[in-house]
Structure formats: C-alpha cells, structure tokens
Amino acid sequence: YGTLVIDPKGGRPKADEMVMVQGGYNTTFDGQGNELYFVNGVPFAYMDRPIRVKKDQLVRIYLTNILEYDPINSFHLHGNFFEYYPTGTRLEPSEFTDTISQVQGQRGILEMRFPFTGRYMFHAHKTEFAELGWMGFFEVVQ
C-alpha cells in the first residue's frame, strides 16, 4: 500500500512529513469483517515504537483510508489539535480539530505542531479499531 503525493506548484511549507495508511486485516477470509486494524500495515506498531517528532516543528501527515468491510475510519489525536485539508487539494485548511472521519478510499492532510515534549496518543475513534491495533504514540522531543 502507499500514497501518491503531488505537491502544489509553489510547494508547501517545510515540515517533517510522513504517510499514514489506515486499514485492516480479515484473517479468517470469511468476508465478515476485519479482526485486526492498523496504520502502515502493522497493528500496534507505534505503541512500542512511537513516531519521534521535534517540539514546535511542523508535522505533516498524508492520511489515507484503505479500510475494507467498515465504511468509516477516523483519526483522533490526544492533547493537541491539527489543521485538516480534505483530499489535499486546497492550500487553506477546512478545520482545526483533534478528530476527523474518512470514508473508504478517502485521503487528507493533517498539519500540527506539538508545543510540549512527551507522548501524544493517536488512534481510531472507534473503540473496536483501537483495541484491535489501530493506535499509537507520537514521542515529542526537544
């Protein structure tokens, strides 16, 4: 899985950029739904190995939802807000929030700065998804 990023002609402000692909696995192949959920292919990966970012640095996330069986996915950030650019086709954000929802195949750009060091949890805002792997941490350092 991956994401194709096309920047606008003038570019975007310099940032620590990353791609997050949201999805799930149906491990029984029964067509009844997912048993595991993830960001970037591995359930719970960022719980044990948080994503390190620098305090006050602009962080840009290209977020893509490829989840099957479940029509809606979400991204929620604890302790901080972000600017959200749906589909990434505009240069001005549509929201300043801590939670967004995406339907299947939807994508968007999140931009944030962390004013304090420490760990900030992120996860799907559906408890089942979070409990089955779709959660992690940002580790904010000096």
What does each model-identified segment do?
Residues 1-142:
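Copper-binding active sites and cupredoxin-like electron-transfer domains
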